[in-house]
């Protein structure tokens, strides 16, 4: 898996000097116990780092400035153990640039009915201390996540971990570099976009290269390197018999191995963690990259076909959120419109990530009726079944919109022996007709990121951090109300953003 930095999250507890040093020391000890136990459970994806209890406006301001300037800090987790007058937090929160989570909890799980006294009440005041803190967050209109519940509850820890992944993806996005080999597919609208605005909004740097730059890298790949990678293919995947029996078919696989090695070296040298290709820009190449792209996606790289840099970058973000699992570049390809059993067949020419596979992928070589090149090698498999979603990031000219549709992936009812590509079938929620009407009204693309792992809540959190519009299509969607929501969002974004 292509790793992110070993980010940390700062745990910051608020209080005030009104209660005396003994009370603040207890707050400090409780905070330390919570952080130690949260880190020890091993369920959180990143380490929580305990910071001092904050009791003055100046200490709060300095802590925020320190968090902003620490490249390893991916966010702040804040909690008011006692009452902490929120005017103290104004100057600090106004300067905060990192993701913020408000953990509304308390150290003790239950009220000690027999022993509770006013000392206990004064110490354990998060029930109203966090409301005071929450008010100033609303007054300042600060983007923040709120999680409520006892800190040892499984659901609280799961939501905390999910948010940490999302925050890390957002922060990592400000260092994301996308390499585009060639340009967009000619005359296609939705894959275009304002790359400067994307860098302003998300931090993404998108750079174009001629395909000749990749071809030169391929020329430098040695036969020994290719042979070793082919051996790895044999260990990980099934190989169609023709690959081992026919030299020209095996040569097609070796060509993809050469592409993979060249692509990876190019990306690593430039610090790129996402990339695009285009079947119309393949001068000097024998095949469209297929197997090579699938393998790199499985390592965590973002990818978009036909120059689609927005989907490539979004895939990289969602790979981080999903910890590299069950997430792929996707395209709505064709429909099964049997009444009462409407389905979408999702696929692409070649480039679907094997992390969504239900079975062991098989390397096969077949003609590709587009691009005008030799028969490319690719991984062939059926997608897994289960709850999933499709997400599409589009550029509306004056802003970005994220469109999300929840789906249910299903096992294919029948084999498709003449379709040798990776593919997945799904049912749209609430139905194919309603979901697709809403999708089209929202301007969602035909390219998406498909994921079994990333949740709608995580995508909402990411969009909120990025300050972009996000709309959801799910079981609760009413198409007429959805159209009104789009109109309200348009008015809000034009007037207030």
UniProtKB/Swiss-Prot annotation:
Pfam family, one: Arabinose_Iso_C
Cofactor(s) named in the record: Mn(2+)
Cofactor descriptive note: Binds 1 Mn(2+) ion per subunit.
Binding-site list for Mn(2+): 306, 331, 348, 447
Catalysed reactions, as listed in the record: beta-L-arabinopyranose = L-ribulose
One Gene Ontology term of the molecular function aspect: L-arabinose isomerase activity
Gene3D superfamilies associated with the record: 3.40.50.10940
This enzyme's EC code(s): 5.3.1.4
The entry's keywords: Arabinose catabolism, Carbohydrate metabolism, Isomerase, Manganese, Metal-binding
SUPFAM superfamilies, alphabetized: FucI/AraA C-terminal domain-like, FucI/AraA N-terminal and middle domains
Biological process annotations from GO: L-arabinose catabolic process to xylulose 5-phosphate
Pathway: Carbohydrate degradation; L-arabinose degradation via L-ribulose; D-xylulose 5-phosphate from L-arabinose (bacterial route): step 1/3
Superkingdom of this protein's organism: Bacteria
Enzyme class: isomerase
InterPro entries (alphabetical): Ara_Isoase_C, AraA_central, AraA_N, AraA_N_sf, Fuc/Ara_isomerase_C, Fucose_isomerase_N/cen_sf, Lara_isomerase
GO cellular component assignments: cytosol
Function (record text): Catalyzes the conversion of L-arabinose to L-ribulose.
Family: Belongs to the arabinose isomerase family.
Protein name: L-arabinose isomerase
Gene name, Swiss-Prot/TrEMBL: araA
